Amino acid sequence: MRSEPAMRRVVITGMGMLTPLGCGVEATWTRLLKGESGAKKIDTFDVSDIACKIACVIPRGDGAGATYNPDQWMEPKEQRKVDEFITFAMCAARQALDDAGWHPKT
């Protein structure tokens, strides 16, 4: 007879988000509650031969106004070594750690 693994409790102590609605939990949540959409017309590359002309993209900028600036979350030298989604994960993870107030020394 197989025994079931013991259930472990998980506690969420911090949150972080990077979404098409903005960088950060507060910005995303506020815009979501206002009924805003992250879907926008694609204007960063030519879509004339693509059927879909809209997408949900991460809002880029200097980091002000809930825009995403990867340099705030990872050194440019390190960014060149990884796929872009890794910088997204680092952004959300750092926000969650800051929200939790957890800043390990090592």
Mark where each language-model region is:
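Conserved "HGTGT" condensation-loop signature of ketosynthase/thiolase-family condensing enzymes
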Residues: 1-106
